[in-house]
A protein has these predicted regions:
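Glycine-rich beta-strand-centered segment in the early N-terminal region that forms part
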Residues: 27-45, 57-98, 104
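Short amphipathic alpha-helix with an adjacent loop that forms part of the alpha/beta core around
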Residues: 211-221
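C-terminal hydrophobic helical "lid"/dimerization subdomain
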Residues: 2-5, 285-338
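Glycine-rich phosphate-binding loop and adjacent beta-alpha segment
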Residues: 179, 234-303, 335-338
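NAD(P)H cofactor-binding loop motif with strongest signal on the N-terminal glycine-rich segment
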Residues: 161-162, 231, 254
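Mid-domain Rossmann-like dinucleotide-binding core that forms the NAD(H)/NADP(H) cofactor-binding site
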Residues: 131-208
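NAD(P)H dinucleotide-binding glycine-rich loop of Rossmann-like/cofactor-binding domains
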Residues: 93-161
Length: 338
């Protein structure tokens, strides 16, 4: 291909407000040995992108600036130095450290190791491919239920926050794996109604009843076997009280706050297993195998990403603000212009 001298990208050179996401020109990357050059089409936004850019991540140090944001996206191969892919292949792009300790996907061209790419099924468009990765909810839910828990069909799952990636997508994974109940929550009646209209039957409207009352109503007073909590904050203690004896509580995020008050007897008397979740705890082979399985689910229609809104890449600051402050129902994406 004809060499490209410069590309458009979203880069921040200081930690701080949304406006630090700047639309800039950068030198174009090239594919080195073992790498693949991908023209990005649609990229996703993860709450972690905001955590890092705002300076609230452990790796948000001066040494990690400047940084191109973005942890995932969908694109097409335009050059390759790897036998694994050929020019014209449509690919998912994601990898460890993207957008945090290495420049990410919010740019026109990305040179990535072949191991960071996966083929996109031909009938999945770029937006839904990016939405599948954005927020990593499918991967989180699948790993919790297959690696943290010896999950069995007919067990029950609670994943609070139906509009977010972890809540919505963990519910879909739980259904696929045969859960008897896959429960989530909504902070408003409008969001609960949207969830019900989208086929999510067991959503607790927290503006009308407490989490505990809702879980007990849906489970006949029993509680749930597994909790996948990406919300945290004040919801944590109440959710823990809904766990069945011997159940597993996976702490995977803190969209609702980093501090929580819990009744320790809910852990002690129930012999509860409380697990912290980080992708760093899994071997690369485990992550790759999980993604391959999930792409199969996506291809067969067993999981279906929901898109809330698509912005142009140049509006990254507004796009991130929309995700963090508006808390939309579904994934927020950015389309990369040619």
């Amino acid at each position: 291909m004809k060499p490209i001298q410069s590309i458009k990208a979203i880069q921040y050179r200081a930690y701080g407000a949304y406006a630090e996401n700047r639309f800039v020109d950068l030198p174009a990357p090239v594919a080195n040995d073992g790498q693949v050059l991908v023209r990005m089409r649609t990229v996703g936004i993860n709450p972690l992108d905001n955590t890092f850019r705002s300076g609230h991540h452990y790796a948000a140090t001066p040494e990690n600036l400047p940084r191109v944001g973005g942890q995932m996206g969908a694109g097409v191969v335009v050059d390759t130095k790897s036998p694994s892919f050929k020019v014209g292949d449509r690919v998912f792009v994601t990898g460890p450290g993207f957008g945090v300790i290495a420049d990410g996907t919010w740019r026109e061209l990305v040179a990535a190791p072949a191991a960071s790419l996966m083929p996109i099924p031909s009938h999945i468009d770029d937006d839904h491919a990016a939405a599948f990765l954005a927020g990593a909810g499918y991967l989180v839910g699948y790993l919790v239920l297959t690696e943290f828990v010896a999950f069995k069909p007919a067990q029950s799952v609670l994943a609070p926050g139906i509009g977010g990636a972890v809540g919505m997508e963990s519910v879909q994974i739980a259904r696929k794996l045969g859960a008897s109940l896959a429960i989530s929550t909504a902070s408003t009646s409008a969001k609960a109604e949207k969830a019900h209209a989208g086929g999510y039957e067991h959503v607790i409207d927290l503006s009308r009843e407490s989490l505990r009352d809702g879980v007990m109503r849906l489970t006949g007073g029993k509680g749930v076997d597994v909790i996948i909590d990406g919300v945290g904050g004040k919801l944590t203690g109440e959710a823990l009280g809904c766990l069945l004896p011997g159940g597993t509580y996976a702490v995977v995020g803190y969209a609702g706050g980093r501090e929580a008050s819990v009744n320790l007897t809910d852990i002690i008397w129930k012999a509860a297993k409380v697990r912290g979740f980080t992708f760093r705890a899994f071997a690369p082979e485990t992550l790759a195998a999980a993604q391959k399985t999930l792409i199969g689910y996506l291809s067969e229609g067993a999981i279906q990403p929901t898109i809330a809104k698509v912005f142009p890449l140049s509006d990254a600051a507004d796009a991130v603000r929309h995700l963090i402050e508006e808390r939309p129902f579904g994934r927020v994406l950015m389309r990369v212009e040619d």
